[in-house]
UniProtKB/Swiss-Prot annotation:
It comes from the Eukaryota. Gene3D superfamilies: SUI1-like domain (3.30.780.10). This is Large ribosomal subunit protein mL49. GO terms for molecular function: structural constituent of ribosome. One of its GO terms (biological process) is translation. The keyword Ribosomal protein applies. Keywords: Mitochondrion, Ribonucleoprotein, Ribosomal protein.
Length: 187
């Protein structure tokens, strides 16, 4: 029946209507490799790089100083801020207090919560002064400091020595008195 209906058409039309299976057989079938048809082909493309000139002078001003400057020279000591440089008397003791990079004594103030006040039902706070960078006989330093503070304050103080870290914690004494003690010793 198909042949009889094809006789009606011209030979040119028949060639257009005829179905050829050779093109499908040569091409890869879609279901055999679905990723090949789904993903685009990879092509290498190198990015272009262009260096932009940047003025780093504003950033360099904010960077910390790599080398610690020398101790500043003043006309008289102590300075108006109360700072004094270390003296030769500091080398005569059994212990030594290394100064920080900004040439100040390594004294740090902490505030910690203490006991509950029963009248106000509020916690009292206590100030602890931590002395760091203690080299040498740290217990001799603590004994000298304790006797100096108890003499000036008139009451006993609590202290804690951390020999491994080279730290002393003092409770019940103002930071200013501890600073005066170390300046009087030449540190």
């Amino acid at each position: 029946m198909l042949g009889s209906s094809l006789r009606i058409f011209s030979p040119r039309a028949v060639s257009r209507l005829s179905f050829s299976t050779t093109s499908v057989e040569k091409a890869e079938k879609l279901w055999e490799n679905p990723w090949k048809h789904a993903l685009p082909e990879k092509s290498r493309s190198l990015a272009t790089v262009e260096e932009a000139p940047i003025d780093w002078s504003y950033v360099e001003r904010l960077m910390p100083i790599e080398v610690v400057p020398n101790v500043p020279e003043h006309e008289k000591y102590p300075t108006p801020s109360g700072w004094t440089p270390p003296t030769e008397a500091a080398k005569t003791h059994q212990y030594y207090i290394r100064r920080r990079h900004d040439h100040l004594l390594p004294l740090y103030l902490e505030r910690k919560r203490d006991l509950l006040n029963e009248k106000t039902l509020d916690f009292d706070y206590v100030e602890l002064v931590t002395i760091r960078n203690v080299d040498g006989d740290i217990f001799a330093c603590e004994n000298d400091l304790r006797s100096y503070l108890e003499e000036h304050l008139g009451h006993s103080i609590a202290s804690h020595v951390d020999e491994l870290k080279g730290r002393i914690k003092i409770k019940g004494a103002p930071r200013v008195l501890i600073e005066q003690f170390f300046y009087s010793k030449g540190f």
